[in-house]
């Protein structure tokens, strides 16, 4: 077995045949690339004992780290009976150091997001994990950042509002720095649904949260889940702020209309066929039901 910084990599090795023996090394089929590889090019997972070729497993891990938002990396075999999960030692052995550090950071951020007793300080330059005192679930709790001493609400992350609800409170505290999401052009904002932090580096203003799949406008945080034609950017304060040319927007709408028309044509064509075939289908179902009833009826045996 190989080792990197004291961590064991479960790379398999084939037993050396006796000298003068020309028996070829056994080959194993990788379930990812479906290619046959020798045992020295395969890696076995600790938890489920599934075997994959090392290059495929490395690529799978890198993609899972970049797209998984810190969630556990599961066995790439879709029919794995043990539902194995990769251990941190395995990940550290097979991916570059920067990718492993990214995985640890995303995993920690996910743990903080899922923990009801921990949250991030909303000050952009702080990035401190704050502890929330236990209270009634869903009720606002005063949280004080141990680093910048900002007092904010545990629910809406706005400045603490003891005598008003989260919806009514829109106060800002510029003396503590720019809060996440208070500026339309802020590089980091919170998803309006799951409140996870999202950073926008480039691209259009139509955003989709990787955590809850909610689609919204980056500038005003309005819901865009049902706006398939992107009409939100035709009027109002976000007009022409989508980030694409007018021609590309029209082409997108044309494609959406084409898909809807195609589905409508398919429905019109298939509906008469279904109506004609429905008596035959009903007869077949009734016949099979009668057969099952006779088979299980004790009076006929």
From Swiss-Prot:
| UniProt source species | Mus musculus (Mouse)
Q: What does the subunit section of this Swiss-Prot or TrEMBL entry state?
A: Interacts with UBE2L3, UBE2L6 and LCMT2, as well as with BAX. Interacts with TBK1; this interaction inhibits TBK1 phosphorylation and 'Lys-63'-linked polyubiquitination.
Q: What does a knockout show? A: Rnf144b deletion mice have a significantly higher overall survival rate than wild-type mice upon EMCV infection.
Q: Tell me, what's a Pfam family for it?
A: IBR_1
Give the CC-aspect GO terms: cytoplasm; mitochondrial membrane
What are the GO BP annotations of this UniProt entry? apoptotic process; negative regulation of apoptotic process; protein ubiquitination; ubiquitin-dependent protein catabolic process
Q: Where are the zinc fingers (RING-type)?
A: 30-80, 191-220
Top-rank taxon, per record: Eukaryota
Compartments annotated for it: namely: Mitochondrion membrane; Cytoplasm
Q: What is this protein called?
A: E3 ubiquitin-protein ligase RNF144B
> Which residues are listed for Zn(2+) 3 binding in this entry?
153, 156, 161, 166
The pathway noted for it is: Protein modification; protein ubiquitination
Give the start-end ranges of region TRIAD supradomain: 26-242
Please give one Gene Ontology molecular function term for this protein.
zinc ion binding
